[in-house]
Amino acid sequence: MSETDHIASTSSDKNVGKTPELKEDSCNLFSGNESSKLENESKLLSLNTDKTLCQPNEHNNRIEAQENYIPDHGGGEDSCAKTDTGSENSEQIANFPSGNFAKHISKTNETEQKVTQILVELRSSTFPESANEKTYSESPYDTDCTKKFISKIKSVSASEDLLEEIESELLSTEFAEHRVPNGMNKGEHALVLFEKCVQDKYLQQEHIIKKLIKENKKHQELFVDICSEKDNLREELKKRTETEKQHMNTIKQLESRIEELNKEVKASRDQLIAQDVTAKNAVQQLHKEMAQRMEQANKKCEEARQEKEAMVMKYVRGEKESLDLRKEKETLEKKLRDANKELEKNTNKIKQLSQEKGRLHQLYETKEGETTRLIREIDKLKEDINSHVIKVKWAQNKLKAEMDSHKETKDKLKETTTKLTQAKEEADQIRKNCQDMIKTYQESEEIKSNELDAKLRVTKGELEKQMQEKSDQLEMHHAKIKELEDLKRTFKEGMDELRTLRTKVKCLEDERLRTEDELSKYKEIINRQKAEIQNLLDKVKTADQLQEQLQRGKQEIENLKEEVESLNSLINDLQKDIEGSRKRESELLLFTERLTSKNAQLQSESNSLQSQFDKVSCSESQLQSQCEQMKQTNINLESRLLKEEELRKEEVQTLQAELACRQTEVKALSTQVEELKDELVTQRRKHASSIKDLTKQLQQARRKLDQVESGSYDKEVSSMGSRSSSSGSLNARSSAEDRSPENTGSSVAVDNFPQVDKAMLIERIVRLQKAHARKNEKIEFMEDHIKQLVEEIRKKTKIIQSYILREESGTLSSEASDFNKVHLSRRGGIMASLYTSHPADNGLTLELSLEINRKLQAVLEDTLLKNITLKENLQTLGTEIERLIKHQHELEQRTKKT
């Protein structure tokens, strides 16, 4: 092959490897005048045959470079065919005898003219410079990309500033004590539990945020390193372009050298006649040398065949290893599936146990509600019994007082009967005194009865008021119970949110590990690229050495032109065989590279599957231990429930027995009260009848006095006895008649119980309806608020889903964060109450904690979005690095071929 052909091939190879635009330019250059140039180059082969005799290996490499370069251009195959035909024709013509020397001189003149035309075209063509400009103008490794990435990295630090602002605000603000709207104190158990849960939640979120900030810093540092390495690669590419420019300069120098050689060729024509005789002797020597070289080439072919067989054996072994790895992979996948199935079974069991636990808890709550209701009813009955006992005692005291007064009246009656005999003279005075006494006595009894009725009414009103107060207290108690239930529900919701956040944190940690693995892979790729760059530099040095060898070969070409023409045909055949063997070797090498890459991938996949299997086995053992613990706790709870149910049943039975006793006592007391009332009525009637008898007796005494004066005392005494008997019968009848209306009056009084005030009832109903409407409005508002929160949580879960269920939240915190927590807990304040188990500051209220939670959640979302953008940027960097690697591989292949 000639020097011009070599120069054109090297320049086209270098310019094609840079950008696709250079490929188009080179295609356009070679498509127009390709056939003429290649014909000229084939004719120049007759002049430059000495080089192939001295260095056949270089010639073979150049032929390979031409064949591998042709597919990059349109119409390259036809041009190659033309060059081959031209070279064969030139070889046929070049094998001239000593007599046809004049024809050879005319043909050499034509070749000189064509060579000068090619050189003019090469000088006029400026495509290497334009290609270099395009590579620098449209290079993908511009610094604007790196500037954008650095600006994004700087924006990540905004999350840290936001966290510092939140901490400063929390430490600077002093909040007043907040009263709970339900009227419950802070020391109650439910609020303490709720605050503890909120504190744990905030601690976990702070741990997560600090860990994410540290990871962001690490990503930033890695990103800056990657950008610096990218800039270094770009500088190396610039150096490569500079070296290519130097090569172009050397090509120009070689063109000038070719012109000088053409001049020397003209001078050598005169010397050819003298050298013709010496050439024949040299040809014989060359025949001997070519025979030796043919033997060496045959040996090399045999070695290549042996290497080919060894590569085939290696390929078979690689296939066996790949099949074994596939089998192991399938077994591991089966184990993973079984482990996943067992995990699902365990999760289903845990769900069933949790459902049973909830059901038992509900039964326990219902039993507690029933026991409280029974206790309240018992308390009511006790109060009623106490009120009845007080009433009975009061009635007994009143009866005793009336009995005493009745005894006094009997004594007075006895005294009056004794004094009747003495009262004859004082009859007028006694009549007046008796009448006054009777009037005063009747008035006093009427006053006493009225006072007793008024007291009864007052006591009844007080009883009604007490009953209303008790009902109000019961309503208040029910409201408090409802508020407690609402607090329990909120506590459960908070616990569920905590669980979801923990799972999200696990996912975040898993993605962090993935990004770290990707970064390590990128580092390995960069190290490989550095090694490849060093290899390329070594190859450049070897290329310089080859250029020196080229110059030496040019000197040898002048001495060995005529001898190479006779041996071109044999060398071409050998070269074709060697090219075929090398192509096969390259294909086998590519195949072995693919096998090694597949083996590495399979090994990495098997390692990852083993790690996943270990994780699954650990999680399965943990779940089994948790299931056993849950079973033990369920057994304990069931035993406790049974014991409590038995105790409550015994208490209910005892209370029912006490109720029955108290009811019997109440019935007995009520019967006693009714009997006492009847006795009171009878005694009143007796008093009235005795007063009537006394009045009649006084009248009879007056009549007796009148009769004594008239002298008919005895007759009237007898009539007096009959009258007294008749008056007694009449008194008995009148007492019976009086008793019946009084009994009816008492029954009417019992029936005419003081009616309940309807206005009070209506007002109370209105109040209850208003409270019910307010509660309904609150419930509707809370439902809408819950729906909005659920929608927000669903949106946020889409962002965080990939970061959940992989790492435990306890492994996120570092020693530095623990020291900071200890320092803040010693200083006191809101942050100290977050980091400790007990509230260190009274300013930490529910509203404040919710605001802190919202701010921290916003910061967490920002950090997650920034992590996602960083991941995308890393992916783009990976694609660019892969492109660089491909570019370097192409350059290596071209340098090897050249």
From Swiss-Prot:
GO CC list: trans-Golgi network
Source organism, top-level taxon: Eukaryota
Bias (Low complexity): 718-734
UniProt region (Disordered), positions on chain: 1-43, 68-95, 702-749
Key words of the record: Acetylation, Coiled coil, Phosphoprotein
Sites bearing N-acetylserine, chain numbering: 2
Listed Polar residues bias regions: 82-95
GO molecular function, one term: small GTPase binding
One of the protein's GO biological processes: response to bacterium
Modified residues (Phosphoserine): 740
Stored InterPro entries: CCDC186 (IPR038830)
Coiled-coil regions, chain positions: 201-712, 759-803, 855-894
UniProt biased composition (Basic and acidic residues): 703-717
PANTHER family: COILED-COIL DOMAIN-CONTAINING PROTEIN 186, CTCL TUMOR ANTIGEN HD-CL-01
Protein name: Coiled-coil domain-containing protein 186
The species this protein was found in: Homo sapiens (Human)
